[in-house]
C-alpha cells in the first residue's frame, strides 16, 4: 500500500496561514489512513474542508476534524459513526505526529490531532497514523492562537484540503 500525502490549506479568521502536507502511514495503518485520506478528498460526500481546529493547547496539540457540528462534539468516519482502533504500533514521538482523537478504545471517527511536542502518555491509547511532511511551522504558528484551557483566540479553519 502506498503512503498517501494529503494537504490542508489553513486560514486564521479567513486569512491564509499556509499549507501543510501530511504523509499517511497506510502501509501499517491502512484503515485509519484511508479514513483520513477520504475525508481530505471528500470522495464519500463529506470532508474536512470548511471545518475548524476547535481545540488548540500550546506545547501539546491542535485538534480538529469535527465537520458535522464544528464544535468538537461531532464525529463521523467513512465507515459509519465510529470504528475500532486498528493498531497502536506508532508512537507519539514529537511535533507533527498525526493521531486520532477518541473517547476511549475503539471510538475513532473523524476527529484528529497534530502533536506539538512528544506526547508519549498517548502511546497505546490513540492511533498515530501520519506525520506532517512539510511546513510543520504552520502547526507551530497555529499554537499561538490556543490557550491552556484548549479554547482558540481566532477561528483556525481548513479552507481547502485534498490529496497530492
Curated annotation (Swiss-Prot):
Q: What UniProt keywords apply to this chain's record, in alphabetical order? A: Cytoplasm, Isomerase, Rotamase
Give this protein's Gene Ontology molecular function annotations.
cyclosporin A binding; peptidyl-prolyl cis-trans isomerase activity
Query: Per the UniProt record, which residue ranges are transmembrane?
Result: none
- What Enzyme Commission number(s) does the record list for this chain? 5.2.1.8
What is any one GO biological process for this UniProt entry? Answer: protein folding
In terms of superkingdom, the source organism counts as Eukaryota
Q: In which tissues is it expressed?
A: Highly expressed in brain, ovary and mammary gland. Moderately expressed in lung, salivary gland, kidney, skin, adipose tissue, intestine and spleen. Weakly expressed in skeletal muscle, liver and stomach. Expressed in pleiomorphic and undifferentiated liposarcomas, osteosarcomas and breast carcinomas.
Location relative to the cell:
Cytoplasm
Q: Which Gene3D superfamilies match?
A: Cyclophilin-like
Q: What general EC class does the enzyme of this chain belong to?
A: isomerase
A GO-annotated cellular component: extracellular exosome
Which residue numbers delimit the PPIase cyclophilin-type domain? 7-163
Report the main location listed first in the record: cytoplasm
Can you state which reaction this protein catalyses? [protein]-peptidylproline (omega=180) = [protein]-peptidylproline (omega=0)
Q: What does this protein do?
A: PPIases accelerate the folding of proteins. It catalyzes the cis-trans isomerization of proline imidic peptide bonds in oligopeptides.
What family does the Swiss-Prot or TrEMBL record give for this protein? Belongs to the cyclophilin-type PPIase family. PPIase A subfamily.
Q: What else is known?
A: It is one of six related genes or pseudogenes found in a cluster, thought to result from gene duplication, on chromosome 1.
Protein name listed in UniProt: Peptidyl-prolyl cis-trans isomerase A-like 4A
**Protein source organism:** Homo sapiens (Human)
Amino acid at each position: 500500500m502506498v503512503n498517501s500525502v494529503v494537504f490542508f490549506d489553513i486560514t486564521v479568521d479567513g486569512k491564509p496561514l499556509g499549507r501543510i502536507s501530511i504523509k499517511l502511514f497506510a502501509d501499517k495503518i491502512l484503515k485509519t489512513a484511508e479514513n483520513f485520506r477520504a475525508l481530505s478528498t471528500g470522495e464519500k460526500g463529506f470532508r474536512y474542508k470548511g471545518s475548524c481546529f476547535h481545540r488548540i493547547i500550546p506545547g501539546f496539540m491542535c485538534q480538529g476534524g469535527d465537520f458535522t457540528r464544528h464544535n468538537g462534539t461531532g464525529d463521523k468516519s467513512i465507515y459509519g459513526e465510529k470504528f475500532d482502533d486498528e493498531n497502536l504500533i506508532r508512537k507519539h514521538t514529537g511535533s507533527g505526529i498525526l493521531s486520532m482523537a477518541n473517547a476511549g478504545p475503539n471510538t475513532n471517527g473523524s476527529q484528529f490531532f497534530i502533536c506539538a511536542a512528544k506526547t508519549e502518555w498517548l502511546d497505546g491509547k490513540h492511533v498515530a497514523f501520519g506525520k506532517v511532511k512539510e511546513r510543520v511551522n504552520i502547526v507551530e504558528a497555529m499554537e499561538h492562537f490556543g490557550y491552556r484551557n484548549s479554547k482558540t483566540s481566532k477561528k483556525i479553519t481548513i479552507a481547502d484540503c485534498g490529496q497530492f
